[in-house]
Amino acid sequence: MKLKDGLILREVAGQFVVVPMGKRVQEVTSIVYISSSGAYLWDYMKDHEFQKEDLVKKILEHYTGVTGEQAAVDIEKFLKTLADNNILDDGKIRGQVFVKMPKGTGKDGV
């Protein structure tokens, strides 16, 4: 998975805010704040495709006193927040997709 393009992270009044640009303004309709650890991950995520395990590893390398189990739970919540706010491109097609098939190629031969 990866972050969608057209999104930047800005620090405003001590808080990290995801700012949509261009066409993303219509998709990301809420103000999304992320923690400093989320901002640390964002810096990696903006330039890489990643899996949950990659982010857990980054957290464990950067922070002391965090267990792998707790990091995995926190990363899952973080990724859900990003996905719920149309920030994460996880490769899944959402919504309806209609494909017009040429005659004779349908499952019933029509």
Where are each of the predicted segments found?
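Long, charge-rich, low-complexity alpha-helical segments
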Residues: 30-110
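Short alpha-helical segments that sit at the start of domains
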Residues: 10-40
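Low-complexity, compositionally biased segments
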Residues: 8-9, 14, 46, 77
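Intrinsically disordered, low-complexity segments enriched in polar/charged residues with Gly/Pro
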Residues: 5, 18-19, 67
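N-terminal entry elements of small recognition
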Residues: 1-7
